[in-house]
């Protein structure tokens, strides 16, 4: 699973989490290795996580990771689930790629587009939070 988290200008202690994405592996694959990730001839896709309970769990762990690691702006959290339903953090990428060509979309692109505000909303969230952070620095 992937969860994109961005700063929330209204409350920097409560970041905004986008609808999570689940990687749909091509037949015969169980791991997102270099050929799956970068060979555009290997068919894979992402689908939006729609289960409310799983979404809440993914959001909770991703937002906590974002805060604990001191990320600002945005970060993409990579999380996996075992057969018992336990979630495991792989990483948080504080500068995950975005705005790839549609045929090469990465997980962050899908999550941004799951949100009705799309890229415009994504960048507005980041810019508004940056202004808040700058005002806080200036006041210190």
Regions found by a protein language model. Give the residues of each.
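ATP-dependent carboxylate activation and anion-phosphoryl transfer catalytic cores
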Residues: 12, 49-140
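Phosphate-binding site of ATP-dependent enzymes
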Residues: 1-53, 57-60, 81-88
């Amino acid at each position: 699973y992937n969860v994109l988290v961005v700063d929330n200008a209204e409350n920097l202690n409560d970041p905004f989490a986008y609808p999570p994405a689940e990687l749909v592996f091509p037949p015969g694959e169980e791991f997102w290795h270099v050929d799956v990730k970068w060979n555009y001839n290997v068919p894979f896709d992402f689908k939006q996580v729609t289960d409310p309970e799983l979404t809440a769990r993914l959001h909770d762990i991703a937002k906590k990771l974002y805060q604990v690691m001191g990320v600002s702006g945005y970060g993409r959290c990579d999380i996996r689930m075992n057969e018992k339903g336990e979630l495991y953090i792989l990483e948080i990428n504080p500068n995950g790629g975005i705005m790839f060509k549609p045929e090469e979309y990465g997980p962050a692109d899908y999550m941004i587009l799951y949100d009705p505000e799309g890229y415009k909303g994504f960048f507005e969230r980041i810019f508004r939070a940056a202004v808040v952070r700058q005002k806080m620095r200036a006041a210190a």
